[in-house]
């Protein structure tokens, strides 16, 4: 991946300009307030999670993921249980199964339910 930093914010205009410059060979996604990631068309966090699931012989239902921005969309889709950070991008909040204040608190709550 290539990460581009825009001090004045990662606007849709910047994302579209990067997409045009990439000529369809790569895909720009917003990854933070001031960041745009440029990814290969066939590779993202969801692809990486799928490889890890196969390697560990676990299925989607045995996987959970946390995300907060556009670069996490495929990751959340690949996980059996997906969490968006409450302060995250609205598109991620709509996609996720649940919303969380922070990862550690959510994991502690889930672990306490198992005891």
Where are these regions (language model features)?
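Asp-based, Mg2+/Mn2+-dependent phosphohydrolase catalytic module
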Residues: 78, 82-115
């Amino acid at each position: 991946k290539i990460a581009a930093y825009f001090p004045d914010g990662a606007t849709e205009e910047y994302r579209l300009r990067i997409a045009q410059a990439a000529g369809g060979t790569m895909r720009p996604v917003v990854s933070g307030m001031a960041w745009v990631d440029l990814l290969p068309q066939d590779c993202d966090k969801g692809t990486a999670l799928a490889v890890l699931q196969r390697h560990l012989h676990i299925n989607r239902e045995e996987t959970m993921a946390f995300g907060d921005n556009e670069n996490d969309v495929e990751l959340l889709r690949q996980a059996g249980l997906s969490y968006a950070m409450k302060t995250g991008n609205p598109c991620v909040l709509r996609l996720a199964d649940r919303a969380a204040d922070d990862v550690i608190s959510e994991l502690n709550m889930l672990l306490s339910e198992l005891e």
